[in-house]
């Protein structure tokens, strides 16, 4: 079966003109064979490994056919079992690469058959990681379970890719990840490790840059942007309160204690009292008005109860004013009617007036009225009772004064 595959002509032999690059190791002369899964695709290229006259002899030899039927996945220069254990010139397999001489193939197959089967079992432990794409020579090592001295560099043929070339500069395995951890951490936190070139701050809400590209903190960057100069590093001293400023003295009264320092028209410092006096009167304050202590304004405390009481009395006065007006108008009416009343009705009128509802209303409102005696001056003749009329007047209430 494999003889026909080995002798078959491949349509793509022109593409892989230098097929010996992947069938032979660059360091030794031992052949490199592929795994059984790739055998159908790789066997058509076997005739191109050697000159054309050797291909039929390779297929017809018994040792070659037996080895291919068993498993042609052998060990090259990159296998876990290096060829250094064999003497120079000896092959790793029970067959030779070229057609051997008479009597050499059969005895080698019987002698090394057990070693070859054991090597196949060890080869099955690494089925896929050893399969590398065909490309340029890469100095990278195998994964972490193989040491670098066991896995030398590979040499493969016409497969090229920019991704594979990028792998040359990256160390393989975990050491490469450890080295790239620090730059990734700094990229994730871009503010770490920066320092303001002006004030030396290490942390700021926002990093800025000056005209030359140096980092500035937020305060220095804003100051530089607004004023065009670097932010001063020396902070201004805190100003003392107006009453504790040392060395100040009023130019008018020569006092050093005041609640507020002012300046006169000449720019000289003056105390609050002298400054206000000059501002209000236009003349300097007399020295006789100087006092040792500061006079403060005596403000009376606001009493809400007193304000409320005064407002209540005002309301009562306002409410009682219409009552006074009505009482005065009613008194005027009484005077007018009394002057117009007849002398006959004068006596009963006074009697009925004492018991009228108007008197009760006046008494309830606590209003006192003074009646002048000339308004109610009656003669004795008018006050004397007349026969036949006194009883009727006392019982009837038709009198105008009584109705009022």
Swiss-Prot record:
Q: Provide one Gene Ontology cellular component.
A: nucleus
| InterPro entries reported in the protein's UniProt record | GATA_N, TF_GATA_4/5/6, Transcription_factor_GATA, Znf_GATA, Znf_NHR/GATA
PANTHER family cross-referenced by the UniProt entry: TRANSCRIPTION FACTOR GATA FAMILY MEMBER, TRANSCRIPTION FACTOR GATA-5
Compositional bias (Gly residues): 102-112
Q: Supply the Gene3D superfamilies for this chain.
A: Erythroid Transcription Factor GATA-1, subunit A
What is the protein name for this chain?
Answer: Transcription factor GATA-5
Coiled coil regions in record: none
A Gene Ontology BP annotation from the UniProt entry: cellular response to hydrogen peroxide
Q: Where are the zinc fingers (GATA-type)?
A: 196-220, 250-274
Q: Does the keyword 4Fe-4S apply?
A: no
Q: Name where it mostly resides.
A: nucleus
| Record keywords, A-Z | Activator, DNA-binding, Metal-binding, Nucleus, Repeat, Transcription, Transcription regulation, Zinc, Zinc-finger
Q: Where is the composition biased (Low complexity)?
A: 87-101, 309-323
Q: Say which species the protein is native to.
A: Mus musculus
Tell me, what does this protein do in biology? Transcription factor required during cardiovascular development. Plays an important role in the transcriptional program(s) that underlies smooth muscle cell diversity. Binds to the functionally important CEF-1 nuclear protein binding site in the cardiac-specific slow/cardiac troponin C transcriptional enhancer.
Among SMART domains, the record links this protein to:
ZnF_GATA (SM00401)
Q: What are the start and end residues of every segment in region (Disordered)?
A: 71-112, 293-332
Location in the cell reads: Nucleus
Point to the regions of Basic residues compositional bias: 296-305
Q: Which GO terms describe its molecular function?
A: cis-regulatory region sequence-specific DNA binding; DNA-binding transcription factor activity, RNA polymerase II-specific; RNA polymerase II cis-regulatory region sequence-specific DNA binding; transcription cis-regulatory region binding; zinc ion binding
Pfam families reported in the protein's UniProt record: GATA, GATA-N
């Amino acid at each position: 079966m494999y003889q026909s595959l080995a002798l078959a002509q491949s349509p793509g032999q022109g593409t892989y003109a230098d097929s010996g690059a992947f069938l032979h190791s660059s360091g030794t002369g031992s052949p490199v064979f592929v795994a059984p899964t790739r055998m159908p695709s790789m066997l058509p290229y076997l005739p191109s490994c050697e000159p054309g006259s050797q291909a039929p002899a390779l297929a017809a030899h018994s040792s070659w056919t037996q080895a291919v039927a068993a498993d042609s996945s052998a060990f090259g220069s990159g296998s876990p079992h290096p060829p250094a254990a064999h003497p120079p010139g000896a092959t790793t397999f029970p067959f030779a690469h070229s057609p051997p001489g008479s009597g050499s193939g059969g005895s080698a197959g019987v002698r090394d058959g057990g070693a070859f089967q054991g090597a196949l079992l060890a080869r099955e432990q690494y089925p896929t990681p050893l399969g590398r794409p065909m490309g340029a020579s890469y100095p990278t090592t195998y994964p972490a379970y193989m040491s670098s001295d066991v896995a030398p560099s590979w040499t493969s043929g016409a497969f090229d890719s920019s991704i594979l070339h990028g792998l040359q500069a990256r160390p393989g395995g975990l050491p490469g990840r450890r080295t790239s951890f620090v730059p990734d951490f700094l990229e994730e936190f871009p503010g770490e490790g920066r320092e303001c070139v002006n004030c030396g701050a290490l942390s700021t809400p926002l990093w800025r840059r000056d005209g030359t590209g140096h980092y500035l903190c937020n305060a220095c960057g804003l100051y530089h942007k607004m004023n065009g100069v670097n932010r001063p590093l020396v902070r201004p001293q805190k100003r003392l309160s107006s009453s504790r400023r040392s060395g100040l003295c009023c130019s008018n009264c020569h006092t050093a204690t005041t609640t507020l320092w002012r300046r006169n028209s000449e720019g000289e410092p003056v105390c609050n009292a002298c400054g206000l006096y000059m501002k209000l009167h236009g003349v300097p304050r007399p020295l006789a008005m100087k006092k040792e202590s500061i006079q403060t304004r005596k403000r009376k405390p606001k009493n809400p109860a007193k304000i409320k009481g005064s407002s209540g009395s005002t309301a009562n006065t306002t409410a009682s004013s219409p009552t006074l007006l009505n009482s005065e108008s009613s008194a005027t009416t009484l005077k007018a009617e009394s002057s117009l009343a007849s002398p006959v009705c004068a006596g009963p009128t006074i009697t009925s007036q004492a018991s009228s509802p108007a008197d009760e209303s006046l008494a309830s409102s606590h209003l006192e009225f003074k009646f002048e005696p000339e308004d109610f001056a009656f003669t004795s003749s008018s006050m004397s009772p007349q026969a036949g009329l006194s009883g009727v007047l006392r019982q009837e209430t038709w009198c105008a004064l009584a109705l009022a």
